[in-house]
């Protein structure tokens, strides 16, 4: 396996990560809990975040035991909270009666509580739909991450971008303003991009590297795919893993992120992922 392949991230809402077999030569395993939202039902809470992952399966005690399991090993494990949404449901907003500073204050307080309760290491920002102007998004999200980092509540901060131009512009601006507080960028390869039919692998690889170039100063650029069949509309799993095989020798790519959500929603078992990644990364 290429020594450049270092980070493996699982994006999940349940405890499927507990039995995950980590791909060979990985130096860091990240679990990203999906999701915390500042919504109570369908109503925005203007920065007051609530865990919406399976809190019966993923408890503070479960995370404590998970981390303890790897203490004797050389593998670093980190657990992050992901804030965001999917499609048009629960979009980012600071509320009609709110403002950026008020949102940042409320978000910092609520996420501080979640991070301390669950002993989390970082935050991931993954909004696919943003119902705010660019300045409000950048100032709010950037201010939140800055507060968490400066108060030493987290050690890892990432955001997820894609080929969706309307969405990506928000993250370009966020990174331009707050680059020092983000160490990881995740590219959601299945969102907003359809590879050419003539040469899908080459066109997907070209797109990934173009996006990676926009964030070339970041510590870790991860390429993401999904085990959920509804996310496969633009291209199938084999296209992704063949593309990953070609990318892992490239210094621009530091690892992979796999969206599992739960064992119940995955269209191929999570236990296959390490084997597929090993095949993709073998040289």
Curated annotation (Swiss-Prot):
Stretches assigned to the GH18 domain: 5-283
Alphabetized UniProt keyword annotations: Glycosidase, Hydrolase
SUPFAM superfamilies membership: (Trans)glycosidases (SSF51445)
Triggers of expression: By fruit removal.
Biological processes, Gene Ontology terms: carbohydrate metabolic process
Active site, renumbered: 128
GO MF annotation terms: hydrolase activity, acting on glycosyl bonds
One family name in Pfam for this protein: Glyco_hydro_18
The keyword Hydrolase appears for this protein: yes
InterPro entries from the UniProt entry: Glyco_hydro18_cat, Glycoside_hydrolase_SF
Organism superkingdom: Eukaryota
Tissue: Leaves.
Protein's UniProt keywords contain Hydrolase: yes
Family: Belongs to the glycosyl hydrolase 18 family.
Complexes and interactors: Forms part of the RuBisCO complex.
Name of the molecule in the record: RuBisCO-associated protein
């Amino acid at each position: 396996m290429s020594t450049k392949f270092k980070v493996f991230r699982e994006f999940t809402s349940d405890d499927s990560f507990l039995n995950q077999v980590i791909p060979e030569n990985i130096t860091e395993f990240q679990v990203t809990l999906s999701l915390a939202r500042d919504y109570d039902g369908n109503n925005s809470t203007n920065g007051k975040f609530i865990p919406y992952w399976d809190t019966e399966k993923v408890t503070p005690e479960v995370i404590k035991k998970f981390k303890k399991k790897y203490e004797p090993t050389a593998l670093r494990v980190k657990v992050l909270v992901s804030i965001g949404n999917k499609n048009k449901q629960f979009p980012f907003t600071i509320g009609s009666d709110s403002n950026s500073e008020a949102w940042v204050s409320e978000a910092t307080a609520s996420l501080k509580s979640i991070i301390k309760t669950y002993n989390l290491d970082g935050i991931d920002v993954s909004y696919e739909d943003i119902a705010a102007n660019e300045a409000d998004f950048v100032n709010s999200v950037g201010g939140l991450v800055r507060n968490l980092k400066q108060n030493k509540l987290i050690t890892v901060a990432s955001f997820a971008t894609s080929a969706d131009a309307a969405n990506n512009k928000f993250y370009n601006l966020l990174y331009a303003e707050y680059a020092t507080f983000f160490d990881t960028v995740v590219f959601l390869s299945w969102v907003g991009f359809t590879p050419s039919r003539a040469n899908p692998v080459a066109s997907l690889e070209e797109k990934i590297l173009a996006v990676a170039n926009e964030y070339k100063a970041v510590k870790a650029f991860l390429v993401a795919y999904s085990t959920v069949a509804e996310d496969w509309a633009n291209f199938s799993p084999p296209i992704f893993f063949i593309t990953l095989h070609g990318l892992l020798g490239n210094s621009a790519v530091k690892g992979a992120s796999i969206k599992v959500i739960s064992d119940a929603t995955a269209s191929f078992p999570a236990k296959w992922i390490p084997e597929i990644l090993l095949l993709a990364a073998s040289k």
